Amino acid sequence: MISNLAYIDPVAFQLGPIEVHWYGIIIAAGILLGYFIAQEGAKRAGLHKDALVDIIFWSAIFGFITARIYFVIFQWPYYAANPAEIPMIWHGGIAIHGGLIGGFITGVIICRRNNHNPLQVGDIIAPSIILAQGIGRWGNFMNHEAHGGPVAKSVLENMHIPEFIINNMYIDGRYYQPTFLYESIWDVLGFALLLFLRKHLRIGETFFTYLIWYSIGRFFVEGLRTDSLMLTSNIRVAQLVSILLILIGIAMIIYRRFKYQPPKYKDVKALPWPK
């Protein structure tokens, strides 16, 4: 039956005059699932579930705000002419890298106030973050955005993907590459990889591995997209940021191994804010 699904309406349902979009539902579902998955790691590390809720909730809230601000900044000519659309986040238009910046800063502040080690907390929630990102890409699918360039329908059929995806890649009279799907699959693989590696890695390295893995996939997928935020006519913002995050992740793992020899993730309980 799923193969017969026709073009999907971005609006899931209405509550009176209020339209509830699939985009928001899917992103919220990804965050909620990520929270439940992170509970196991938090419990093992001795991090109280209320502390986990505070970190995830407030990081998500401020992450959404900075994700929107980031997007608006790089599309400023449009929003300067249409300022009423700036708060219309349900139309899409949030940038994951902007969300990561806001979420990271918020998480660090909460960790500092509550005497938690931010890198240990990062290790706990990194698998949840990348899984939520993978799920969230289906919100882009429902909004018919974040796709690649035009392709023939036969190209999509030869990929052996479900027909409902092919149907919804038909936008404004043309078929497009489902780049949302490429990134979603990459993120889900990253989720499995991080869970497998985490027990073997040292404190902080799961989080830095997340930055590296996600950024590698994002760099290549971004090159296929048609809606990239551009720094110049030839430089895509997300690709530049991805390169920086890869370098930061690799450098931090190497530096901390040689400088501090941090303990393995599996060998420690709750760590305080680093002295």
UniProtKB/Swiss-Prot annotation:
Enzyme class: transferase
Transmembrane segments: 18-38, 55-75, 89-109, 203-223, 235-255
Record's bilayer topology term: Multi-pass membrane protein
Annotated pathway: Protein modification; lipoprotein biosynthesis (diacylglyceryl transfer)
Signal peptide: none
Localization terms from the record: Cell membrane
Pfam families assigned to the protein according to its UniProt record, in alphabetical order: LGT
EC identifiers of the protein: 2.5.1.145
Matching InterPro entries: Lgt
GO cellular component: plasma membrane
One GO biological process term: lipoprotein biosynthetic process
Record-listed a 1,2-diacyl-sn-glycero-3-phospho-(1'-sn-glycerol) binding positions: 137
Key words of the record: Cell membrane, Membrane, Transferase, Transmembrane, Transmembrane helix
Gene Ontology molecular function terms on file: phosphatidylglycerol-prolipoprotein diacylglyceryl transferase activity
Family designation: Belongs to the Lgt family.
Function per UniProt: Catalyzes the transfer of the diacylglyceryl group from phosphatidylglycerol to the sulfhydryl group of the N-terminal cysteine of a prolipoprotein, the first step in the formation of mature lipoproteins.
Record-linked NCBIfam families: lgt
Protein name: Phosphatidylglycerol--prolipoprotein diacylglyceryl transferase
Protein encoded by which gene: lgt
